[in-house]
Amino acid sequence: MASLSGSISSLFLKEFVGAFFLSMRYFFRQKATINYPFEKGPVSPRFRGEHALRRYPNGEERCIACKLCEAICPAQAITIEAGPRRNDGTRRTVRYDIDMVKCIYCGFCQEACPVDAIVEGPNFEFATETREELYFDKARLLDNGDRWEREIARNIAIDSPYR
């Protein structure tokens, strides 16, 4: 009796017909994938991507060399050298380096910064061919900040109620 039931099932291709209708149900739904290099998905305002140093609107860098980001970094990826005090009593950095090979993108540096100088921006496309290109110096970080300032400021404004 079991062989008769199996023969009838295989004769009418029960599994094939069931799989076909299952495929057709998903065939007409909206696609869930994107064509990545040409299309990009939405990125959250809290996304932690490539690091950037920000400037004030007058062009002066925000970093006050307090070294809180260097102290809180669990991967010890940040190195800061502070310059001498200026006439107005403030300090600025002489050297600000981030070893992106060590960085774990935890965002602690951004949370610790009292003046929002170091931020993790929206850029996630910064692959390199050599490890040396992943050692960001102050000039590269400031350049990133200048390039992404509009989006960084918008993301910080959106996230401000939760900070």
Curated annotation (Swiss-Prot):
> Which InterPro entries does the record associate with it?
4Fe4S_Fe-S-bd (IPR017896), 4Fe4S_Fe_S_CS (IPR017900), NADH_quinone_OxRdtase_chainI (IPR010226)
Q: Which GO terms describe its molecular function?
A: 4 iron, 4 sulfur cluster binding; iron ion binding; NADH:ubiquinone reductase (non-electrogenic) activity; quinone binding
Membrane spanning residue stretches: none
Co-factor(s): [4Fe-4S] cluster
Recorded topology in the membrane: Peripheral membrane protein
Which UniProt keyword terms apply here?
A: 4Fe-4S, Cell inner membrane, Cell membrane, Iron, Iron-sulfur, Membrane, Metal-binding, NAD, Quinone, Repeat, Translocase, Ubiquinone
Which residues are involved in binding [4Fe-4S] cluster 1?
C63, C66, C69, C113
Record's family?
Belongs to the complex I 23 kDa subunit family.
Q: What is the official name of this protein in its record?
A: NADH-quinone oxidoreductase subunit I
User: Quick one: which gene encodes this?
Assistant: nuoI
